[in-house]
From Swiss-Prot:
A Gene Ontology molecular function term of the record: kinase activity
Major site of localization recorded for this protein: cytoplasm
Residues holding Zn(2+): 63, 78
Stretches assigned to the PTS EIIA type-1 domain: 26-130
Free-text domain note: The EIIA domain is phosphorylated by phospho-HPr on a histidyl residue. Then, it transfers the phosphoryl group to the EIIB domain.
Gene: crr
The name this protein goes by in its record: PTS system glucose-specific EIIA component
CDD domains noted in UniProt: PTS_IIA_glc (cd00210)
């Protein structure tokens, strides 16, 4: 199929600062145990889908979302560190598991001020749990706006 050879553009899920996984204070992400990727230090409360695809994972705690693209690439957006312990408090989800989403669709609103007081960090990793054999290229570091192209999977 033609879409298997296309590059996948990955959008910033929110306003913030793009950082490397080396700057995330969690060994699972820093050591890339779940896959390669990058993180965003968020500055806006609304988080949007970084790619189009099927929402294969929507945690009931609303802190993490897994999206599978039509080409089979799987991306995990994990909002903050140890946020699973909040049991959804401070998170309002707008999507359900198995829903199709388009890049830029709003997934969740997070009360970042409240959440930041209760967890080690609000840095939010975007991980390629299945990169489909492609190579990740981060094309924009530092300050970004939601919807900016920040990475390309080639």
């Amino acid at each position: 199929m033609w879409f298997f050879n296309k590059n996948l553009k990955v959008l910033a899920p929110c306003d913030g600062t793009i950082i490397t996984l080396d700057e995330v204070e969690d060994e699972v992400f820093k050591e890339r145990m779940l896959g390669d990727g990058f993180a965003i230090n968020p500055k806006s409360n609304d988080f949007h889908a970084p790619v189009s695809g099927k929402l294969v994972t929507a945690f009931p705690t609303k802190h993490a979302f897994g999206i599978q693209t039509k080409s089979g690439v799987e991306i995990l957006l994990h909002i903050g560190l140890d946020t699973v312990s909040l049991d959804g408090n401070g998170f309002e989800s707008f999507v359900t598991q198995d829903q199709e989403v388009n890049a830029g669709d709003k997934l969740v609103t997070v009360d970042l001020k409240s959440v930041a007081k209760k967890v080690p960090s609000i840095k939010s990793p975007i991980i390629f749990t299945n990169n489909g054999g492609k190579t990740l290229e981060i094309v924009k570091m530092g300050e970004v706006k939601q919807g900016d192209v920040v990475a390309i999977l080639k």
